[in-house]
Every structure is written in structure tokens, then in C-alpha cells.
Amino acid sequence: LIGFILKYAEKDTDIYKLACELSKEAYNYFKKNFPLESMHESACFVELYHYMKECSIFNLLDMEEFKKMLQKQIKQVITYDTKIWSTDYICKPSLFINSKSSDFYLENKEICDFEYQFILKTQNEDGSWGVTWEWNDYPEEWAISKNWWQSDIIIKNIKYIREFNL
């Protein structure tokens, strides 16, 4: 959300100034708690980095240090045991890297390219991909949510295939 505000809010507004302060707080939190355990929390910081870079905001944080720490963070949370990718709730590089021009692609090229091939190999005949997790404690909610998650996976996988067409 901070990145969105930095990108779209007018620079002379209070909300933009608040986003600048919150980005500093978030960065300090990241540094203090590095490395993070959560792939989702990690993805939020990668997204903040991308927004700031896209908007050429280089004066709020040490962007080079941020980039180096994020590179280590990404390597920390990606699941490299690819045998469980089809069956478990895991972290793939696409959570952080959505193009070959990403600052994080080259150091993760091999696993990104593997994911590309994995996506192609695991597509079902109907064009979808399976959801590899369940909400066992919430069967009624899962019956609905599984379709939503499957749609999300389809969209993300098609975008990944298009971007990483090897």
C-alpha cells in the first residue's frame, strides 16, 4: 500500500508524506528483522522496492542496500526442493520475480527458468493448474475459495509464461 501511495499520490499531499515516513519505518523493520521467515511479508518488501525504483525514489532509503538484502531474502524463502512443488504450499520465485528485467532475476535465473518449465509441464488438460493446499478447518469456505485461488493461479501462470517465454 505504501508503494501504491508513493506512485499515485500527489507529492505535496499529507498522504504522500506519510507514505514516505512509513516506507522508512518499513525499511528499518526489514533491516531489524532480517532475514524474515514469511514469504508473504518478504513479497511486500520486494513490491515496495519495485514501486520505489519505478518512481525513481532513491533519496528515502539506501536502495542499493535494500536490493542486496532483498536478494538474500528471496534466496532464503524460495523453496528449492522442487519435488514438493506439485503437492505442498511452497514459495516459488514468481512471487518476487515477474520479468527478466527484474533486479532479482539474474541471481535466480536457474530457478526462474525451472519454474517456467514446471508451469508448462503441470498445466491440466482444461488449461488450469491445481491448487496445492487446502483449508481443512474451513471446508465450506474452501469450496468457494478454491475456485478463486485457481483463477488467480491461472492468471499468474499465463503472465509468467508470456514474460519468460524461453
Model-derived segments and their meaning:
Residues I2-L166:
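Preference for long, amphipathic alpha-helical scaffolds in soluble/luminal domains
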